Amino acid sequence: MSETALKPVVMYNTLSGNKQELKTIEPGRCGIYCCGPTVYGLTHLGNSRAAVVPDIMVRFLRHQGLEVKYVRNVTDIDDKIIKRSQEEGMSPDELARKYTEEYHRDLASLNTLEPDVEPKVSDTIPEILDLVQQLVDKGLAYAVDGDVYYRVKAFGGYGKLSKRSVDEMLEGAGARIEVDTRKETPLDFAVWKAAKPGEPAWDSPWGPGRPGWHIECSAMSATHLGDSFDIHGGGRDLIFPHHENEIAQSQGAHGEDTYARYWVHNGFINFAGEKMSKSLGNFFTTREITALFPGETVRYFLTTVHYRSGLNFDLEVLCPGCSAVLDKAAQESGLCPSCGMQSSTEVLKDQVRFPNLEEADDRLAYIYSTLAQARAFLTTAKEPGIAEPALDPVLGMLEAFIEHMRNDFNTGGALGVLSKPLSEVNALLTSGKGVSKAQRHGTIKAFVEQMAEVADILGCFGADPGPWLELRRDMKARRLKLDTSRVDSLLRERQTARQEKDWAAADRIRDELIALGVAVQDGPEGSTWSFI
């Protein structure tokens, strides 16, 4: 824990509409509930952002000395699961188990912590039934033909999270959605659904059925965190109706002063100007992207902007002839307007680039390269007898980083703090001119030590630099279709030329490698290569 950990954490609360100091219900402890996946398919990058954001919050609050209980649910009962199970020819339970495992695999590749509790809807049926019964007993829900609906007009605070008026919603409801005449108002939503043939069902006082979507989170959060807890998180798309309905259910059952104190919502990932989502079909799965880039690169990319901001995911298709970026029309026709080359769809599939992911990959490689050199320096350099304080900006790096994190978990601002220290350390690694040996050593040592704390908070920069850089290099080579066996062969030829003191041949081979986009690093144990 940092020595500055006693300063307050300020966070934006969707419920209040402004930033507030985090004051937990129980001093020193924090309960966090986040809506997890509906497990009917592989996760896309937007789903992964909704997991990485609370993961960083949990890491940071623990770093600041709080004892955090983190609960993230799995929705394993849902209309989408039932539909997909029929398409894949398996039971809903089998499909949910399959994609829960795949979800865990994807999050492991992004270095997310496991939640302290991961409840499933199917394991929470008794608690859900009890909550539905409480709502019925209080006149907040009513049964119709085996369905049970929440009576929205009976809850006076409805709309306070999403800042919507019940009367205005009712005025336009009939035009937006098909009206179910069995419901008292179009806004009433199901907390229990009557069984349909071939679907999962449980016995209830209202007949066989299954839970509605919103009641599930109300029941699971109360079961594991109590009627009141500190932070509720999720994607911005869940504010209405899901989180609004959670509040209505939970406060309706337990009282107006209960449920989550702070509501946090992450922004969308935007692809081609639209929110990335399964419903729109404009998404890349996390699995597809981590086949091209290290998982840590993806995680780093997700942290480069403030969690409430939108994050643009860019894709470019290049002409295989002249490397010009093709617009949508050129991609569809296959004709490059710059050089006139005609390419098939199959050829263009191999010309896809992800510029902002590549930028994140390059930046992460720069940080790991700096860490590798800094650690090597500390291993080989003789430690001075007299310690001297680190130079600015390394001296205050961690404190400045933490200040940004205290201000609504601002990872984008926190990452910006690292730029000057990285430049300073690289300069010191290259040359120690102008500073004492003790100050040079102390600055590099302080950088490595502070980066270890940064790594604990962000979940980035904590891997062994050498193996990570090799992994990154090999994955980039595959993306660029670079023949690494050819590179290795040229390195061996160059090594032979150097041993034979044929400097002209060694330089010629180096130039050939440069033309391939490869830089050579000569060391006492031989030569290695990296991308320029």
Residue ranges and their predicted role:
Residues L66, L140, V518:
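Short phosphate-binding/catalytic loops that engage adenosine nucleotides
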Residues S2-Y40, D55, R105, P126-R375:
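Alpha-helical recognition segments enriched in aromatics with Gly/Pro capping
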Residues V74-D79, T100-Y103, L113-I128, G146-F155:
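Short, glycine/charge-rich beta-strand/loop segments that flank catalytic centers
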Residues S85-P92, D116-S122, G235-R236:
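The substrate-binding groove and active-site-proximal loops of carbohydrate-active enzymes
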Residues T285-I532:
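Structural preference for alpha-helix termini/caps and helix-kink/transition segments
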Residues L6, S16-E21, I25-L113, E525, ...:
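N-terminal, positively charged nucleic-acid-binding surface of large information/translation enzymes
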